[in-house]
Every structure is written in structure tokens, then in C-alpha cells.
Amino acid sequence: MKMGTRRAHRQARTVWAAGTVTALCAVALSGCGATAHSARPSASHASASLDAPSQLDPPRPAPDISLTNSLGQRATHSRYRGKAVLLTFIYDHCPDVCPLIVANLHNALSMLGARAREVQIVAVSVDPKGDTPATVKAFLAAREMTGRMQYLIGSLRELAPVWRAWGVAVQATPDRREVGHSAFVYGINASGNVTALYPANLKPAWIAHDAPLLAAE
């Protein structure tokens, strides 16, 4: 597949061991205003570019996710086979990086027009206590993403295995007002394989270009 991400330097790599994603580049933590480190970091770490997408070669199967959304409905990643899936990890009271990611994804959907129906955006919470059905609903409504993004929440016991499976580092500040976390967007093709990794400051045009290609695979 010749995607827009091939034009970027491959400044990040992902290793996959025993069915678990360990993102070498996903250890750069976005504290949403804070600097944090994971208490239990991934086995291998490397610095990552925050201004260019990366192609994952070869693609690898995406670890499945089974969590509930803000409506209490169970959602799994495998449910979206046949679509391009853009997966990210955020929290709804983040002051900067998370809203930026969602705004860029919203703009990408607008650029896609009718083809946006081929894309499913999924967000997984990194704040089990702060992200509630009510706050998530308000977050989605404020950003015109109601019905356009599945925002999955749960308890720490439910979310922590998902973070580990995706190599996402999470650490709340002592006052729990902010959460340091890996801030990337994973591009998953229609066959359920992760093929690309986008930085938090992704350009909507990258997604508008790549999403139809992901949906066709």
C-alpha cells in the first residue's frame, strides 16, 4: 500500500511480542501540561518524532479491545472489521493534547465527506476515575463527535490490560488533575492490522489520504 505515511521518515518503530504491542515510540508521554513516567514502562523504549507519521512494516494484528462506551454499550475492536479504525488514548478533561487530537480527527472526517462512513474513530480512556458517562457525553457533544467517535471507559482493572496490550504508558499526577500518557493515533486497516502510527499533532490531510486506503485493505 502506498500511503501518505510512506512519504514520512520512519522515525518510529513498533515491536510486537507474544501478541502484545510494545510501542517503542509510544513512551513519549503527553502529560497534558505535565511530565510523567509510567510506573511500569514497556520493555523497550525509544524517542519518537512528534511531527511525522510512521508506517509499521510489516503490519501486525491489533490486540482486541472489549470495553463499554458512554451509553453503557459493549464495544470491541473486532466489531469494526471492514472499516478503517483510528484508535487513540485520551481523557476528557485534558487541557491541551487530547482536544487537539480529537479536533484533528474531526477535521479529517469533514475532509473525507461521504467516505467518512468507512472510518471508525475509537478513543480509550486513560482516566478510569475522571472519565464518566456524563463527562464523556459532554466532551463528545462539545466537539461535535457524538455518534462519530466511540469513547470507551471502564475501571482501572478493565482499562489497565488494554493500556499494556497497546504499549500505552499512563501516570496520573499526585493531585489527579492531569494524566501523563502516550499520545498517538493508531491506524488500523479493514483486516484488523495496525499499519500506521500518527503523532498527536497529526495533520487532518494525512488521515483524509490514508483512511480510504486503510478501509480498502
Q: What annotation goes with each model-predicted range?
A:
Residues M1-D64, T68, E217:
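N-terminal targeting signals for export/organelle localization
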